Amino acid sequence: MKQILRAFLFLLLFTATVNTAIADEKANVTKQGTVRGRIIDATKQTLPGASIYIEKLHTGVTSDVNGFYTFSNLDPGTYTVKVSYVGYSPVELKITIPAGRTLEKDVVLNEGVELQEVVVGGAFQGQRRAINSQKNNMGITNVVSADQVGKFPDSNIGDALKRISGINVQYDQGEARFGQVRGTSADLSSVTINGNRVPSAEGDTRNVQLDLIPADMIQTIEVNKVVTADMDGDAIGGSINLVTKNSPYKRTIAATAGTGYNWVSEKAQLNLGFTYGDRFFNDKLGLIVSASYQNSPSGSYDTEFVWEQDDNGKTYVNDYQIRQYYVTRERQSYSAALDWDINANHKLTFKGIFNNRNDWENRYRTTLKDLDPDGNATVRIQTKAGTPDNRNARLERQRTMDFALGGEHLFGALSMDWHASYAKASEERPNERYIDFQLKKQKFDMDLSDERQPFASSKTGSTMTLNDEFSLKELTEQQEDIKEQDLKFSTNFKLPFKNGNKLKFGAKVVRKTKDKEVDFYEYSPLDEDAFMTNSLANTVDQTNKNFMPNNKYQAGIYASKEYTGSLDLNNASLFEKEQVQEELAGNFNARETVTSGYLRFDQKLTKDVELMTGLRIENTNLAYTGRTYDADEDLTSKTDRQRNSYINFLPSLLVKWNVNDDFKVRGSFTQTLSRPKYSALVPSVNLSLIHI
């Protein structure tokens, strides 16, 4: 109730402010005109974030990410317009606004020259664009351009993000996978492509895998640390917007090729990229297409230890692991963008991007399990692999795609844009296999003098090397299929007033579906002695004198990936097959519909002080189906569909003080939300009766 009351009072204040501005408007606006155009440099590269200022009206705008600007609701007449951009000489020009019509006026800026010194700045053009966008934005933002990303050997967009202040990342095999804004969890920030939220291929969370998208497919990275009313509200940490390449002002052809070498895999890497863009039909139709391919064989050495404390307060290692990974990651990405200028007042756009990542992984792991203070433990030796059609490795295939159709329209003083999009993310893990051997009651001497590198050495009669004393602990195969799909439609309206004030309002509908299906089987050989004989005859030695944590650790001998992958597990004359029902309990089917609307008012309080007030309302409807697991019967079944709905009122207030051209002071108050993880919403039930 308090939340509704706060939102109501905020809306009253908002309405009063807007009404005051509207009262200042002339009743007749049909005779007023509009000027729109694009800011470019001498090479016909667009300049986003340029400042365009009409001196007579004491009002200004900034060019958008494609360099476009618009002034509407202008009285007919002649105006002096000033255009400025960091690193370029400012331009002052006169324009004449026709009554009831739209004037198209592109502006060309030239790079500035100081003291007759010739400065070669081609490598920093995108960086200047990013600085201008940060400088002129109302909120607190960081913008990274393509040329800034290109300075570093970043294979994916996550690695590029880690170079932005306030962003830290979570790694997987040395590559940045999840981004965290201002120290919050990865699922508390939103990741969007061209303003559309990216669905997640993760099973139980809303985290978006940033390592799916190659860095060279993105034109600009925008990190909004303050979420405004016209942005999705589920972004407590902030919003990361990835802007794909836009159609150029002139023909563009670019190709890149690169390579590298990984010392763990001892293999070469390959990076390829291509971009083509041009304009056709008297510059009415713009097109750009891009493709990227990366193949990166790599690996890692790993030691992991779990420390415990006994009853006397003495610390000891309870779990001791040595791991050797071999990983090959292949990325393919394709994007296209089209824009069609129907006339000065109407424009249609299309953008699409498809990303595919194949991740082949083999892991060899030696574990001292349940290690006690006296050095007693069970030795476990495990190989992770896959079937021959997947290179005998665990294949994780993740895909994301986003296709958006949109339009921009100008009706007198009122401008409108709309977007309809389809997005999908998926993860497949076919035939993921684990073979695990164990040997109980082994004794080890533990050297705990170095807490970072504790070391276990076998006592006489004990071993941690696979031999005929070991027995099969576990042989499993898993199939995983996760899909998330989004259908979105949004529309936004913008109405300019006098003195640079603007009213923006709009609505959005998002229909989300997510399904997780995991199938898990355990296999028991009918002749275990023959199976162990075959296993010991098909081993691989992973001993490596260059083991990076310290060469005193050695991974040892394991069942080979080729042997593990070749096992005919579905042959009933060789193996007994059992479906593990408990593993199916995490499956679910989710349906979400989020309907939202917002009001946002931008007001110039003085020449140097700007105020933005806004209110966003989001209505969320949920329908989830989980699984019930009966431990006594060892059966899994679907639950009834559970429904729920809730409404959130999200006010925002931003202030910007332009002390001078190079000094800006910003302040903000915003309210955002975090949607629960899928695992927290799924109606799962575990049943087990205790008999006394």
Predicted regions and their residues:
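Short, acidic, small-residue-rich periplasmic hinge/interaction motif at the N-terminus
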Residues: 24-32, 36-45, 50-55, 84-88, ...
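Short acidic/polar hinge/loop motifs at secondary-structure boundaries
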Residues: 72, 197-225
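Structural signature of Gram-negative outer-membrane beta-barrels, strongest in the C-terminal barrel
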Residues: 341-343, 400-404, 421-423, 482-488, ...
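Extracytoplasmic beta-strand/coil segments of soluble accessory domains associated
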Residues: 158-197
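Transmembrane beta-barrel strands of outer-membrane/channel proteins
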Residues: 253-261, 272-274, 289-295, 350-356, ...
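Short, acidic Ser/Thr/Gly-rich low-complexity loop/linker segments typical of extracellular
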Residues: 57-68
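N-terminal periplasmic accessory domains that precede
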Residues: 103-107, 157-160, 177-180, 192, ...
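Transmembrane beta-barrel wall of Gram-negative outer-membrane proteins
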Residues: 267-367, 398-405, 412, 651-653
